[in-house]
Regions:
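Conserved N-terminal beta1-alpha1 strand-loop-helix module at the mouth
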Residues: 1-89, 116-173, 178-233
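Intrinsic disorder/low-complexity segments
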Residues: 90-119, 233-235
Length: 235
């Protein structure tokens, strides 16, 4: 089971969370969010995947931020269509090929473009409350790496409330997904229970329930959660 900590905002806090070695760190690039990220992402382990969270953003802007911040994953939290994702992936590949070609022309290594060894992962978010029609996911199966199921609410994520996880019992696909939406320390036993199910849960996504204020994560609480849920899985 992987762990993603989303809504990172402040340099010192980012470094502290990174020391806990989550698998993903999420940075929200959405001006309407209280956790909108601007500035510099500090250096941390390459094993942690930098994830950019976008909401109905222009593809050109997504591409530019992927390149600027060397993002490993893109989380689409809006109404992005299959056509949008296909075009996004096409432009990502074109950008990658262009950089490879340009690097061949640049003799000094320090001036060469950074090129990720892996393709950028695409995570598509869907909101759930008391019920969900999983048929809407079918067209996305061929274009995403993962789904992320969050609580349908007023905000685009970070609402701090859980949806009815029993809805997921009807999930009919093999595509792995992130489980999100108001997960906190008080949910450890419930999380352990759903982890034992046959559902293809790839990762847990946590955010507001571990904050002292928007964008600032409580390190000790995250450490306890990781040790209780993620680490216990291997024992």
């Amino acid at each position: 089971m992987k762990l993603k900590v989303c809504g990172m905002k402040y340099v010192e806090n980012i470094q502290q969370v990174a020391e806990l070695q989550p698998d993903y760190l999420g940075f929200i690039f959405y001006e309407k969010s209280k956790r909108n990220f601007e500035g510099i992402i500090p250096e941390f382990s390459n094993s942690i995947k930098k994830t950019g969270v976008f909401v109905n953003e222009y593809i050109e802007i997504v591409i530019s931020l992927v390149e600027e911040y060397r993002l490993d994953a893109i989380q689409l939290h809006g109404d992005e269509t299959v056509a949008y994702i296909k075009e996004l992936k096409c432009q990502l590949e074109s950008s990658r090929e262009l950089k490879i070609e340009e690097n061949k022309q640049i003799k000094k290594k320090k001036n060469q473009h950074y090129i990720s060894k892996n393709d950028v992962e695409v995570i598509k978010v869907f909101g759930i409350k008391d019920e969900f029609n999983f048929d809407v996911l079918k067209p996305y199966l061929e274009v995403v790496d993962y789904f992320l199921f969050d609580t349908k609410g007023k905000e685009r994520g970070g609402n701090g409330t859980k949806f009815d996880w029993s809805v997921l019992e009807k999930y009919p696909f093999d595509t792995p997904f992130f489980l999100s939406g108001g997960i906190g320390l008080e949910d450890v036993e419930e999380v352990k229970k759903i982890m034992k199910s046959n559902l293809p849960i790839y990762a847990l996504d946590v955010n507001s329930k571990f904050e002292s204020k928007p964008g600032v994560k409580r390190i000790e609480d995250l450490k306890e959660f990781k040790e209780s849920v993620i680490s216990s899985e291997t024992k």
